C-alpha cells in the first residue's frame, strides 16, 4: 500500500482513503486522544501515535520506552509483552556473550520488563468480528539436557526432523537460536544447560548448541520409532554415560554434561568398587538401567505418539542432504513428489506473503551438516500454493541461494522474495550476512525477483546495549546497504521490521517500507476481536507514520497458534481456560476467516506467520504457555492440520 492510508472496512466495497473527517474505526480510538503523549514533531505528519496507557505509568527519560511506558513496545502488544513473548525470527544468538551477561531485552530490569498492556476493553469497544463478512470456506540433534544422553542406537537419523531436536535450539539468554520465535524464560529457569567443551568454535559465533543427532531434509517427518527414541533419550538421560550410539559415525555424539548423571558417578566411586561389592553393584546398575530404559521407552513412546500426521517415507528416502540428492536427483516441477505436493486442493493462494526459514541454516553448524536443497524445494512447492511472496530472515548457510534455486526448478515465474539480513551486536555476524547479501545480488542477473531487502528483524532489542544505541547501529547498517546498492545500480527497496510501536520518525526516514510485527494473540484479545484489533492497531500506530509520503506499509508478522493455552496479555496468567487469547484450531480458523479475505479485498499487505510448525521450539514452552511450536498452518510433514480450513475467498487469489 502506498500513498494515503486506506480504511479497513468490514463491509465489502467500503474501501477508501482516510480523510480528516472520518471517524475512527472503533470507539476505543478516541481513548488515545484523551492522553497527552510525546509528539515527535517530525515533518510530514510523522507524529508519534498516542498510547492507551495513562501517563501515570510512563517512565521519564526513557523516550517512552521504559517499564510500563506510554507506547512501550506495542501499546496493546507492548514492549513488555514483546520482552516476555518476543516473537523472534532471525539468528537471535548472543554469540559474543557469556552466561552471566544478559542483553538488555532479556535483563530483569530491562526497559519494558514488566507488562504495560492494558487489558482489552469491553466487547462494545471493538467491532465484533461477528459483524464481519466472514468467509466460508536439520538438522536435528539431541542436546545435552543436564544429564541427558547420547542418542540411542538408531536415533541418529540424518533425514528426519525431531519434535525435540534442532540444530538451533536456544538456551534462554545464552543462545536464542537462529531464526527462532520463542517466549523468554523470565524466571531464568532455562530448560537446557550448555557444556562449553561441546561448543563448535568458528572464531566469532558461539553458543550454538551441538547435538547428538543430525537430521537431513528428506522430510519434515519424524518416524514414530525415531520420535520415541528421541523422547526416551530425553526422559532416560541417565543412560548417556553408559550407552554410546552405534550411529556415531554419522554425526557427532555428545555425552551428558560433565559432572552430571551416571557418567560422573561412573568416573567417581563406581569406577573403583570396593572389594567384595562388585557383583552387588553390578546388579544394582543393571536394575537401574532396566528401570530407566522402561521409563524412557514409555515417555519416548508417548512423545512419538503425539507427532500426529507424519509424512510417509518413500522407498527412496535418504539419510543426508547429499544422499537425498543422490537418490532423488535435483527435484523440480516434473518430479512425482513435487507434483503431489503442488496438488493440494485444501491450500489456497490467499496470503500476500509468508514468513519462512529453511531448516538447518544455523551457522556454523551448517558447515558440517549442510541443509538440503531438495527439502527447500519441497517447502517452496507447498508455499507456492499459499502465496507468491516469501520472506527470509537471514543469509547464512546459502539459504537465499537454495530458495532461488527452488523457485527456478519449480518454474515459479510469479514468485518473489524478500531478502533478509540478521542484525545484532556481533559485527562479524552482521558483516558476514551483509557480504552474503551482496554476493547473492551480484550473482543474480534479474533482480526483479526481489521485492526488497529487510535489514534486521526486531533489531532494536538486540543490536545495542540500549534501544537508542540499537537504532543508531541499525540505521548505520541500512545506510551502508543503501550506499552499496546505489554504487552498484541495485534498485530494490531497503527496509527493516520491528514491533509496531517501536517505529519512529528516524526509523521511517531510514526505511523505504514500514514493516510492523503485530500479534493480537499476545495482546490478550479474544479471537472474535482479533481481526478488528489488528487493523486498529496497525492503522493507528503505523499507517499514520507514512502519511504524506509514498512509503508502503506492511504487517511483517501476524498469525495465531493452533494450541497450547491462552494468553491474557501477560503470558499464560489467565483466570480460566477461556479468558484472553485462546490458542486452538477453531480460534485459528476464526481469525483467518475474519482477517484473510477482508485483508485481501482491502489490499492489506502482510506476511502470515507461519506455514509450518517448528517442533523444536517445544523447549521454550512453559507450564501454562505451550504454543511456541504450534504456529504453522501445517505440521512439520507439510500436512494441513486436522480441522484447519484455509479460506478460499471465493476464488480470489493474492498477487
Swiss-Prot record:
Tell me the residue ranges located in the Extracellular compartment per UniProt: 304-655
One GO cellular component, as annotated: plasma membrane
Residues on the membrane's Cytoplasmic side span 1-282
Annotated Polar residues bias: 19-33
| Transmembrane annotation, as ranges | 283-303
Q: Which of the seven top EC classes does this enzyme belong to?
A: hydrolase
UniProt-listed InterPro entries: Beta-glucan_modifiers (IPR050732), Glycoside_hydrolase_SF (IPR017853)
Question: Origin, by domain of life?
Answer: Eukaryota
* Annotated membrane topology: Single-pass type II membrane protein
EC number of this enzyme: 3.2.1.39
Among SUPFAM superfamilies, the record links this protein to:
(Trans)glycosidases
Which keywords does UniProt give here? Carbohydrate metabolism, Cell membrane, Cell wall biogenesis/degradation, Glycoprotein, Hydrolase, Membrane, Polysaccharide degradation, Signal-anchor, Transmembrane, Transmembrane helix
Q: Give the sugar-modified residues.
A: 426, 576, 602
Q: Specify where the region named Disordered lies, as residue ranges.
A: 1-61, 89-114, 305-338
* Coiled-coil annotated spans: none
Q: Which GO terms describe its biological process?
A: cell wall organization; polysaccharide catabolic process
Q: Where in the cell is it found?
A: Cell membrane
What spans are recorded as compositionally biased (Basic and acidic residues)? 89-98, 323-338
Q: Does the keyword Hydrolase apply?
A: yes
Tell me what reaction this enzyme catalyses: Hydrolysis of (1->3)-beta-D-glucosidic linkages in (1->3)-beta-D-glucans
Tell me, what is one Gene Ontology molecular-function annotation carried by this entry? glucan endo-1,3-beta-D-glucosidase activity
Q: Which residues form the active site?
A: 458 (proton donor), 557 (nucleophile)
What does the sequence similarity comment in the record state about its family? Belongs to the glycosyl hydrolase 17 family.
What is this protein for, i.e. what is its function? Glucanases play a role in cell expansion during growth, in cell-cell fusion during mating, and in spore release during sporulation. This enzyme may be involved in beta-glucan degradation. Active on laminarin and lichenan.
Query: What is the protein name given in its UniProt record?
Result: Probable glucan endo-1,3-beta-glucosidase btgC
